[in-house]
Amino acid sequence: MPNIDLENNRLISFDGAELGLTVWDTEEAPEIVVVGVHGMNDYANAFHMAAPYWAARGVKTYAYDQRGFGRSVGRGEWPDEDLMREDLRTAIALVKARHPDATLAVVGISMGGAVAMSAFGSGRPPEGVDRVVFSGPGLRGWGTIPAIQRVALWTSVRVRPGWVVRPPRFVKIEPSDNIEMLRRLWSDPLGIRTNKIEQVHGVVSVMESAHRAAPNLPASVPMLLTYGAKDIVIPEKGLRRTAKRLPGHVRSAYYPDGYHMLLRDLQAETVFDDVLAFLRDAEAPLPSQVGPVPGHTAR
């Protein structure tokens, strides 16, 4: 039976799968509650900077480890993306049951943003949610990849799905300007450092699902998409491809000094405050007054 087990830091999902769970509580009953969904190779710790900041301001966060990551079942194995969306629906329902009178928000980071976008844009969007934030969402689907790379990936996943891939040593990807945070992240045993080709195929597929679902995001739920101009993990090409498909009710914020890990960058508090303002009032101006993401003509 689905359940939140705070004593053992776990969330029991719809099929009995045990998922790791971290909760950042507030001193008093929260007016706003966040369900946090982390990105690729990460786990609930992705919220270790944002959640305490929000908790001090009355926002409680429940961040779970998606299956295949962190403390959850199937670590290192790629789960079916339908299961990932169902885990999100389950987490939302469980948190809503614990806080029926609070404003309920989903904050999805990178791959977690793609999972959230594909879930809310599906034929069965999660119920009971009042806000959604896509933080540096994973929007690097099949349509952004050169044809020769697509063919190579499709072939590899069928011929050798367990093949472990590593980026060349000369390829240096900086997901954040917060170097101390990155050093701790790289040494965290709950993070994943290498991926099988099936995992690469899987994450590209869920990002493509998010792109295709974007036009169907429900107008009944206020949404905010945030993106950093210095994000080289999810290139702006992928963002623009999806941004022009977003419905008019989706707001966006483009941070000139932001990297991929917006919620862990050196300027993270700027983003924390913007997200907090949006959670409190979806129509309110963002404190940073940054402009919309490129290619997005909505608000």
Residue ranges and their predicted role:
Residues 41-44, 70-103:
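Catalytic nucleophile-loop/oxyanion-hole region of alpha/beta-hydrolase
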Residues 109-196:
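Alpha/beta-hydrolase-fold enzymes
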Residues 39-52, 237:
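The serine-hydrolase catalytic nucleophile loop
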Residues 219, 225-227, 231:
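Short beta-strand/loop motif that positions the catalytic acidic residue
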Residues 1-26:
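N-terminal cap/lid segment of alpha/beta-hydrolase-fold proteins
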Residues 232-238:
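Conserved alpha/beta-hydrolase "acid-adjacent" motif
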Residues 249-299:
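Catalytic active-site module of serine/aspartate enzymes centered on a nucleophile-bearing elbow/loop
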Residues 51-75:
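Conserved alpha/beta-hydrolase
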